[in-house]
Curated annotation (Swiss-Prot):
It comes from the Eukaryota. This is Chorion class CB protein M5H4. InterPro entries: Chorion. Coiled coil: none annotated. Residues 21-71 are annotated as: Left arm. GO terms for biological process: chorion-containing eggshell formation. Residues 1-20 form the signal peptide. One of its GO terms (molecular function) is structural constituent of egg chorion. GO terms for cellular component: egg chorion. Residues 143-174 are annotated as: Right arm. Residues 72-142 are annotated as: Central domain. Keywords: Repeat, Signal. It comes from Bombyx mori (Silk moth). This protein is one of many from the eggshell of the silk moth.
Amino acid sequence: MTTIVVLICASALFVQLAFSQCLGRDPVIGFGGAYGSGWGGYDAISPYDGLGYGVPYSAGFIGLSPSNLAASCGGALAVNSLSPTTPTGLTVASENTIEGNLGIFGQLPFLGAVATDGAFSTGGIGAVLYGCGDGAIGIVSEAPIVAPASIGYGQWPVNAGYKGIGPCGCGGLY
């Protein structure tokens, strides 16, 4: 029985190690004393501000800052492959007959080669232009993520934004 419990706990630990990502935290703004004034950690025992997970002088976002949510920030997710065979890649194929001028552009998820196969008319030309950009490998199409504006924690008695603490949120501007 002990072996089964240890095996289940070890499996849960390995799953958490494989699928977890640290997004960090930003400071709580507005309080004095142990909570600081928005320039440090949000508790008295931890001055952690998540360097690399948000600006030290945060713009008032409690929790995750927008820079934490982009796929290109916050460190890399490690990918390990222990397959006995090499991946063969990704194939994008079209069985259509295409006549006239054709321009195809887009993003493929891995570095690789481009090949054309099929019958080309002798009166036209066929060319493949291939470039590997800035080294970003993957299906990446990002736009800036804008978080809702936050009033933040104010002074007592209003305390949590312009509406105070109540059933309708804490007064963020959505």
